[in-house]
Amino acid sequence: RLCRAQGLSMQYSTALSDGVLALACLICVVQLGKRYAGAQPEQRPRWFCILLGFALPAAAAAVGAVRFGLLPELGELHGWLSRASSFLGLPLLGLAALSLGRNWQWQGPTWGRLLLGLCAFFELFRQLDRLDEYRLFLQLSSLLLLLYGGLLRWPQRRPLVLALGASGLLVFAGLVVGTDGFLGPVRRIDLFHALLTPAYPLLAWLMIDLAQTQSRANTL
């Protein structure tokens, strides 16, 4: 009984950390949704993809909170949403940072092709049983695009600082902390969620800041 109680306690701690992460991402979705509503029609495909980049981790974290707190049978759905966040959400944010930093105004069909391409490469590497390697490559590439987008605004410092802060938290969470086992008395997945919680608001701030400093648009 004691072991079962301890397991439930740690399960509830993960539900709590997932819930806090979901709330942080949801706040980002609300704020970015205002940008989408006020954007010009040609800018809305980009803002839609940015919103998707935050909505996927918000959904994954919300389902995770319910899974670890109430309904363990939601594990499959939670895993699917978590993979979508990794293989689709973060890359979309990296591409958005690139387009904003370079002042590129990609049209809806361009964003559609990028979405389809990400889905196609996911299926390809799944068939090749190389998803772990592809995930690492995709996430590191996305973080580099975020940093590049911030660097393109130099000598304005804030975009680069935001990109460094968000990327640093994501790298530390993914490569150092991980999600399996414990770090002292703390479950690693809870610490992982705690690091992602400030990372996503920093990413939202970066997107808004890059959009505000965009001075011209090159239509592709």
Residue ranges and their predicted role:
Residues 79-150:
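Membrane-proximal helix-loop-helix units in multi-pass membrane proteins
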Residues 4-76:
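N-terminal topogenic module of multi-pass integral membrane proteins
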Residues 151-220:
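C-terminal transmembrane-bundle signature of multipass membrane proteins
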Residues 18, 51-58, 113-117, 143, ...:
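Residues within membrane-spanning alpha-helices of integral membrane proteins
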